[in-house]
Regions:
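N-terminal topogenic membrane-targeting module
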Residues: 71-160, 166, 408, 412-413
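Short, glycine/acidic-rich hinge or "gate" loops at secondary-structure transitions
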Residues: 174-182, 256-263
Length: 578
């Protein structure tokens, strides 16, 4: 039976009082914009005139002209035939002449007054000044996962972010909420087995969330003049706007920090796997290099929901990136006046291994996504804007309907009695110490799944034979290696998880999570100071209690037969003190 004690996971996050997001306006000029109608009419008139000049009958000339005009107004995936032909020709031209992408402007640091030496990184992106914030994990806690559902209280408050668009005397052009995450890491067999275990669960083991603030000096001339004018006034105004966003989110309990110039540059490079934009080749549906293939999608108008945002993370791949761009509706906001309407567009980028044989995983059609055909480079690499017709809009409060987790879910531990999968991080920067109290099988199962989500594990144990079997089955020394008690210091430097099984730890290793294995019954010795504690029931080995700073949650451990091959042949024994 599932038991929750002091664990404030919101199982029904939507209140009836939350306003709904609406699809963009769909008037006549939205359905048939002049940019489509006029060229189509001109093409139809030219075709009809040519038919008359060739002595065709009048009704034939009219039919030809009308048919050509109609053909030009019909849209396929929000694009008419003339746009498709134009994009095809432009794509061939770009690929023939090679990439001519201008390098991004260099980022620079601005000292933050009265902050003890903190710097804020800034860079220009065309007419916009960009600053960036990184969202930190508040506390380590379980995440509940269901098909197209992610339940966590550690989420980005989009409503508060939207209210930061229009400040006292400053207006931001946009706030991009950018989430990049991975389900699994590596190509070992344990990764494929873990994917089978996950099935349709939207489990993103690791997730980085950043907020990119876009400041338009032309829209804030008065505020800039009040702060000295020119470049200095522009920088001061952008810094003030950034600090106000940090302060407002911190008031809401969100840990955010400003990125320095070096970190801003590194974040941009990390999004492209440390490559330059010119290293990528554009195709009709993708951009790719020798190792990675990236596919871009937009969300159809009216389809943006928390269920869709969760379902995106259920698709296997190298990584997934989601960008929610919040912009004030032009008619409703200005400096000093709160925006009563906010527009939001969604970009989804799904990355796969370009060297993978056969068909690669794709976003399922039922999610309601639309491919960025012919526009992959402009949007994925150049940061171009998405068609405003795909935007949803509403008051800032309506964004409470969209759940954006602030951190990764970690690895799956088990399931609740009402069918939710339960995941919790067992390694990473926010997890310094983990305690597992129970049989060896439970610990090895958790280590196996940690490897599937990217952990590099070194084990110090008084029962090395039991661990050597698992290491041999994994078959990847960089992922799992076993050291004799007190040895293996040379391996610990590269490890992200160090397991001490019957061996006293040598102190905290930088960047590595320490996992202590305790014999059944050692509950009292395991609790103090640990970020996560897993306690196996003494009467039911399938029942595991998860303890974190947020509370206690008891779940049923879930395994699949493929995992048993790694675990069943391992000899079990009680760890002996070193």
């Amino acid at each position: 039976m599932s038991e929750v004690s002091g664990l404030p996971i919101n199982r029904n996050p939507l209140s009836p009082g939350i306003p709904a997001l609406r699809s963009g306006p769909r008037g006549l000029f939205d359905l048939l914009p002049l940019s489509v109608v006029l060229p189509a009419a001109a093409a139809g008139a030219a075709a009809g005139t040519a038919a008359v000049a060739l002595h065709a009958q009048l009704w034939v000339s009219l039919a030809i002209g009308f048919g050509i005009a109609l053909l030009g107004t019909i849209k396929i995936e929000q694009t008419n035939i003339w746009q498709i032909l134009g994009m095809r020709i432009a794509l061939r031209w770009r690929n023939r002449r090679g990439s001519a992408i201008q390098p991004a402007a260099a980022a620079f640091d601005v000292p933050v007054p009265e902050s003890g030496g903190v710097h804020c990184g800034m860079r220009w992106d065309g007419r916009y000044m960009i600053t960036m914030l990184e969202v930190g994990q508040a506390t380590v806690a379980p995440t509940l996962l269901g098909p197209a559902q992610i339940r966590t209280d550690d989420a980005v408050p989009l409503t508060e972010a939207a209210r930061c668009l229009s400040q006292f005397d400053i207006r931001l052009a946009a706030i991009d909420v950018v989430t990049q995450g991975v389900r699994t890491q590596g190509d070992q067999e344990v990764v494929r087995i873990y994917e089978q275990l996950l099935g349709p669960l939207p489990a993103s083991a690791a997730r980085t969330v950043r907020l990119a603030l876009r400041f338009d000096p032309l829209d804030n001339t008065e505020a800039i003049d009040n702060r000295g004018g020119g470049d200095e006034g522009t920088i001061r105004t952008a810094l003030v706007a950034t600090r106000r966003v940090v302060s407002r989110l911190a008031t809401d309990g969100v840990r955010v920090r400003m990125l320095t110039a070096a970190e801003l540059t590194a974040a941009d490079a990390d999004a492209l796997y440390d490559t330059a934009p010119q290293d990528w080749t554009e195709q009709w549906h993708t951009v790719r290099n020798d190792a990675v293939e990236m596919s871009g999608y937009t969300v159809r108008s009216g389809r943006l929901t928390s269920e869709l945002l969760a379902g995106i993370w259920a698709v296997p791949g190298l990584s997934t990136l989601v960008r929610l761009r919040l912009t004030p509706v032009a008619r409703s906001a200005g400096p000093g006046r709160a925006a009563d309407e906010v527009a939001v567009t969604a970009l989804v980028r799904h990355d796969t291994n370009a060297t993978m044989p056969g068909d690669r995983p794709e976003m399922p059609a039922e999610l309601g996504l639309r491919r960025l055909t012919g526009r992959q480079r402009r949007i994925l690499l150049d940061g171009g804007h998405i068609d405003p017709a795909t935007a949803s809009s509403g008051p800032p409060a309506a964004l409470a309907r969209l759940a954006v987790p602030a951190a990764g879910s970690g690895q799956v531990i088990g399931a609740t009695s009402d069918g939710f999968g339960v995941a919790v991080p067992l390694f990473g920067p926010a997890v310094r110490r983990v305690e597992i109290v129970g049989q060896l099988r439970l610990t090895q199962l958790m280590v196996l799944r940690a490897i599937a989500v990217g952990a590099k594990v070194i084990v110090h144990s008084t029962r090395p034979d039991a661990w050597s079997h698992l290491a041999a089955e994994v078959g990847e020394p960089t992922a799992l290696s076993v050291s004799s008690p007190g040895g293996g210091a040379q391996h610990a430097a590269a490890a992200t998880m160090i397991v001490y099984d019957g061996v006293g730890s040598a102190g905290q290793v930088a960047e590595a999570t320490v996992l202590h294995v305790r014999a059944p019954g050692e509950v009292s010795a395991a609790v103090p100071g640990a970020d996560v504690v897993l306690v196996e029931s003494a009467t039911d080995p399938h029942e595991v209690t998860i303890r974190t700073a947020r509370g206690v949650l008891t779940v049923r451990a879930v395994t699949i037969p493929e995992e048993s091959r790694y675990l069943d042949a391992a000899p079990d024994s009680v760890p002996q003190p070193a």
